[in-house]
């Protein structure tokens, strides 16, 4: 049996002699490479936190001590050390989540996987324990990149204000190529004032502040001015301690002994402490280290030796179609600029950045700032394209409403991973945008059904300069081209039977599902018209009179049923005095468990068979004319 196989709970880890810890680290890395390449998942981040996670569980008493993982994609090692070693169905239906999960273990606390939130959670948990007289430590592990999020600094400000509140912040800094000098630094927890890496660590602190929206630059200037001329002008020690936080580090995050010593020192301090650990993303796996883009942040199913993908691809992804088209548009229009929030590659803007480096900005974990900055860019005469994951736009709703829409700014939002994303679980599904954004005056929302319409509707969107526009598309590969038979107003007619009784309104990617549904209904003697509204907000004015020609309207969307496109269509029909019932098919008002997209859609009834069955059962009974009675 391996050392790892004998670890069933954190106390088993504490019993290990120090000389076995290095061997355990290697076993964990081998396990991760073989397991994650079989299922897909976050590989690079977890390879980088092996020793750090071991040290955390040797020093603290989870779950009495609460260990919080910001974002949570680096929690695989934590799962292994807390009794969850069956990774055979990682991120699959019935298997382990790719993020912490309270349903899985009492050792997990935060499962939302949205960055920069852990420090706020830690602040609240620590205060709750103090109020209720409970013992135990609260430890928040946050990445250096997540410190660019404004929420993290709001939390730091409040944490620092409670000077007698024991709370430990571990910064997992894996975004720099430098490493601390080992020896006196690691063993004695000294500062870097006398080491060769001193200036680099100062640059880290300066960089974090200067990339932090709104408060970062003034805070940096204030600290610089207060200590100007002193040897430690930009020292992380000075920055964080001026905020009221004890600073320990930087520590070699791959030296278990050094990390344990730092954590024990922090544990003894009766107040907030920040422990700065330097780690290497992808450590121990050469292909990850050699991967310049993101050190295998996320991988699909692949051969661990050759790194060749083993899962078949069905063509280009929605993201790549957008990425190619925005480059073409950028070449035609010098006013087109782009913004993203720490997602340059995932949202398809890498090629745009290569081609137009002075016209793209990665603002960090700062969706709110992205939206407001876009309003400024638009007011200044440019047309910004803000590309983010659909689930993360929730953070910028107020800014989209009050800064972009209220001022009628020509900003285009591009939402990647819209609808059901599947294996990434509850917090990554982009299933709320078409509901939340229905209330934004002047906003136009496009839901393309295929690659051609991503290109066409993106061009239509960036042509609008007096109001915000939004285009949304899902994850994974684009399906086949879906041609239109006709155009009625702004609607594309995709299917029309001779005597249609049902009007199927297909929202974006659900067009193929609706076409298959129409075939099933036709086999049952029920004729259909299938239309793609293309722009789902506002409702096209030709839709109500078209609906009046049918006995039932069914709206099928990859979005919440609550207040979504179906609700907007029903409202439009009511306003037009069209008395035709509307059936809404969408995502129920619940959080969705992780599974493949097709499995999730089947579970919630968004399949052709299920939709056709429910439409057939709910179609109003046709009233036959009464027969005349003989005289």
Curated annotation (Swiss-Prot):
The UniProt entry's GO CC annotations, sorted and at most eight, read: cytosol
Q: How does activity depend on temperature?
A: Optimum temperature is 42-44 degrees Celsius.
So, what pathway does this thing act in?
A: Metabolic intermediate biosynthesis; 1-deoxy-D-xylulose 5-phosphate biosynthesis; 1-deoxy-D-xylulose 5-phosphate from D-glyceraldehyde 3-phosphate and pyruvate: step 1/1
One of the entry's Gene Ontology molecular-function terms is: 1-deoxy-D-xylulose-5-phosphate synthase activity
The note describing how and how many cofactors are bound reads:
Binds 1 Mg(2+) ion per subunit. Binds 1 thiamine pyrophosphate per subunit.
Q: How does activity depend on pH?
A: Optimum pH is 9.0.
**Which superkingdom does the taxonomy of this entry point to?**
Bacteria
- The UniProt annotation places Mg(2+) binding at 174
State the SMART domains in the record: Transket_pyr (SM00861)
Q: Which UniProt keywords apply?
A: Isoprene biosynthesis, Magnesium, Metal-binding, Thiamine biosynthesis, Thiamine pyrophosphate, Transferase
| Documented EC number(s) | 2.2.1.7
* BP GO annotations: 1-deoxy-D-xylulose 5-phosphate biosynthetic process; isopentenyl diphosphate biosynthetic process, methylerythritol 4-phosphate pathway; terpenoid biosynthetic process; thiamine biosynthetic process
Q: Does the keyword Transcription apply?
A: no
Q: Which cysteines are joined by disulfide bonds?
A: none
Could you say which residues bind thiamine diphosphate here?
73, 113-115, 174, 285, 367
- Please report which protein family the annotation says this sequence is part of: Belongs to the transketolase family. DXPS subfamily.
What is the protein named?
A: 1-deoxy-D-xylulose-5-phosphate synthase
What is the organism of origin for this protein?
Answer: Streptomyces sp. (strain CL190)
């Amino acid at each position: 049996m391996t050392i790892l196989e004998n670890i069933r709970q954190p106390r088993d880890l504490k019993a290990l002699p120090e000389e076995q810890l290095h061997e355990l680290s290697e076993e964990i890395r081998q396990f991760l490479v073989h397991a994650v390449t079989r299922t897909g998942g976050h590989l690079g981040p977890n390879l980088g936190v092996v020793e750090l996670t071991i040290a955390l569980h040797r020093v603290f008493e989870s779950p009495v001590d609460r260990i919080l993982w910001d974002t949570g994609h680096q929690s695989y090692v934590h799962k292994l050390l807390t009794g969850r070693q069956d990774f055979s169905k990682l991120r699959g239906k019935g298997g382990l989540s790719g993020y912490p999960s309270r349903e899985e273990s009492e050792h997990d606390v935060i499962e939302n996987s949205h960055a920069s939130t852990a420090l706020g959670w830690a602040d609240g948990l620590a205060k709750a324990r103090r109020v209720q007289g409970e013992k135990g430590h609260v430890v928040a592990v946050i990445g250096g990149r997540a410190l660019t999020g404004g929420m993290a600094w709001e939390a730091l400000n409040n944490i620092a204000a409670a000077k007698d509140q024991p709370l430990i912040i571990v910064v997992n800094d894996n975004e720099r190529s430098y490493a601390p000098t080992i020896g006196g630094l690691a063993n004695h927890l000294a500062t870097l004032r006398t080491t060769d890496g001193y200036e680099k660590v100062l640059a880290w602190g300066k960089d974090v502040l200067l990339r932090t929206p709104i408060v970062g630059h003034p805070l940096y200037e204030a600290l610089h001015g207060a200590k100007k001329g002193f040897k430690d002008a930009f020292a992380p020690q000075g920055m964080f301690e001026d905020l009221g936080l004890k600073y320990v580090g930087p520590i070699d995050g791959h030296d278990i002994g050094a990390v344990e010593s730092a954590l024990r020192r922090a544990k003894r301090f009766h107040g907030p402490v920040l422990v700065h650990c330097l780690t290497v993303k992808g450590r121990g796996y050469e292909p990850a280290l050699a991967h310049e883009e993101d050190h295998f942040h996320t991988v699909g199913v692949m051969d661990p030796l050759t790194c060749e993908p083993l899962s078949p691809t069905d063509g280009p992804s929605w993201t790549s179609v957008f990425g190619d088209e925005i480059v073409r548009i950028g070449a035609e229009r010098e006013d087109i600029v782009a913004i993203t929030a720490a997602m340059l590659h995932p949202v398809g803007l890498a090629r745009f950045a290569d081609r137009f480096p002075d016209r793209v900005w990665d603002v960090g974990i700062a969706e709110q700032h992205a939206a407001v900055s876009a309003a400024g860019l638009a007011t200044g005469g440019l047309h910004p394209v803000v590309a983010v994951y659909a689930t993360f736009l929730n953070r910028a709703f107020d800014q989209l409403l009050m800064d972009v829409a209220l001022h009628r700014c020509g900003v285009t939002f591009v939402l990647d991973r819209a609808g059901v994303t599947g294996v990434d679980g509850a917090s990554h599904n982009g299933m709320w945008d078409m509901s939340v954004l229905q209330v934004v005056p002047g906003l136009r929302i496009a839901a393309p059904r295929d690659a051609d319409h991503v290109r066409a509707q993106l061009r239509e969107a960036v042509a609008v300069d007096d109001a915000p526009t939004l285009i949304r598309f899902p994850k994974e590969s684009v399906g086949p081209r879906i041609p239109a038979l006709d155009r009625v107003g702004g609607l594309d007619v995709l299917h029309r039977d001779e005597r249609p009784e049902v009007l199927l309104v297909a929202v974006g990617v659900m067009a193929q599902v609706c076409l298959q549904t129409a075939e099933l209904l036709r086999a049952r003697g029920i004729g259909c018209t299938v239309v793609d509204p293309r722009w789902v907000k506002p409702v096209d004015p030709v839709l109500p009179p078209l609906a009046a020609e049918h006995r039932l309207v069914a709206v099928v969307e990859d979005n919440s049923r609550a207040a979504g496109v179906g609700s907007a269509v029903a409202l439009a029909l009511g306003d037009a005095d069209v008395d035709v019932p509307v059936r809404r098919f969408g995502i129920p008002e619940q959080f969705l468990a992780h599974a493949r997209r097709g499995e999730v859609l089947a579970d919630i009834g968004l399949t052709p068979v299920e939709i056709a069955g429910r439409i057939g059962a709910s179609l109003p009974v046709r009233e036959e004319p009464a027969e005349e009675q003989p005289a």
